[in-house]
Amino acid sequence: MIFNREEQHLMLEGSVLSKEDVKRLVACHTEEASGFLYELYRFLEEWFSDSPYLTVKTSGSTGTPKQLKVRKEQMMQSARLTCEFLGLRQGDSVLLCMPLQYIAGKMVVVRALVAGLNLVIRTPSGHPMADVDIPLRFAAMVPLQVYNTLQVSAEKERLCRTDILIIGGGAIDAGLEAEIRQLPVKVYSTYGMTETLSHIALRRLNGPDASMLYRPFHSVRLSLSSEHTLVIDAPLVCDTTLVTNDVAEIYSDGSFSILGRKDNTINTGGIKVQAEQIEEILRPWMRVPFAITSVPDARLGEAVVLLVEKGADAELPETKMKELLSKYQLPKMILSVGAIPLTETGKINRAACRQLALTYRTDC
């Protein structure tokens, strides 16, 4: 592992780039001419600068995206934790197919710098394996990229030649997880956030070690707040203890599960239900994009609302809904909308969904 940035270089598809090479490449390229490759050069230029800090952007899934200043030293520690856990070694080929504006993409590059990995880059798209011809040791994707890859036989075959795949940035539904269980690749779901510089825990999705629970890295200590949200003490990657908005359960062996976000807890008639849990129950039965949100209600406090994108098969019969959900989980309103609001990273934009439901109710 190389922690001195002055001694680091990037192996990019077999070619070695030094700090001086990066300066030259940035000077002779333009964003229009070089696209994603130019973004990579600009990130490397920022990485090799004298500043010990980088600025990263949060996804904004529960509100307005914000800028965070993070320490490069802590990003390198995060990279070390992942590389050691997954057994990544110098010369291993790893795929960068996620945007560099966010921490997930940046950390793929930092892992390559710290561990001497060979970085294979593809412009972020829904089909990252479309033209990856070399076997990969490691790849990181969002659920939609994995889903799309599994629908195309040639891309699925390429994915199956990858040793390790981590999936983050969104929920993995039951149908996709069932497909993943059949893959020969070691596949993990990640838990983390921008504030923890990518993931601090992993959950194996297939093979004999498959589990429904996340296991934190050895240097991470977890507890629960008075509101049953996860509290993270990860001194290698975060200077302060982080109280999250994720409602969780922690088990005696140190593993944990996430029930949903506190922001997405709906208090309806004095009973708390989680938007994510309702979505998980309905997902196998819904043929169009949808989301659960809520609106204020004089009698219940909050009323559960189902937003459904307009489509021929959008409606789920009320009888089936009653069969699947408890009376408190059952939507009191079903609204047909043009599109489910999403963030730049493809997550449900919860704040926008709530506003959409409020606007619709006011208009009605």
Briefly describe each language-model feature range.
Residues 53-80, 87:
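Conserved AMP-binding A3 loop
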Residues 39-56, 90-93:
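Conserved pre-ATP/AMP-binding loop-to-beta segment of ANL
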Residues 305-307, 320-364:
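Conserved C-terminal "lid"/linker of ANL adenylate-forming enzymes
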Residues 247-329:
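AMP-binding/adenylate-forming catalytic core of the ANL superfamily
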Residues 71-77, 93-148:
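AMP-binding/adenylate-forming
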Residues 152-207:
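Gly/Ser/Thr-rich phosphate-binding loop
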Residues 185-226, 238-239, 364:
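Conserved ATP-binding loop and adjacent catalytic segment of the adenylate-forming AMP-binding
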Residues 221-243, 247-249, 255, 309:
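AMP-binding/adenylate-forming core of the ANL superfamily
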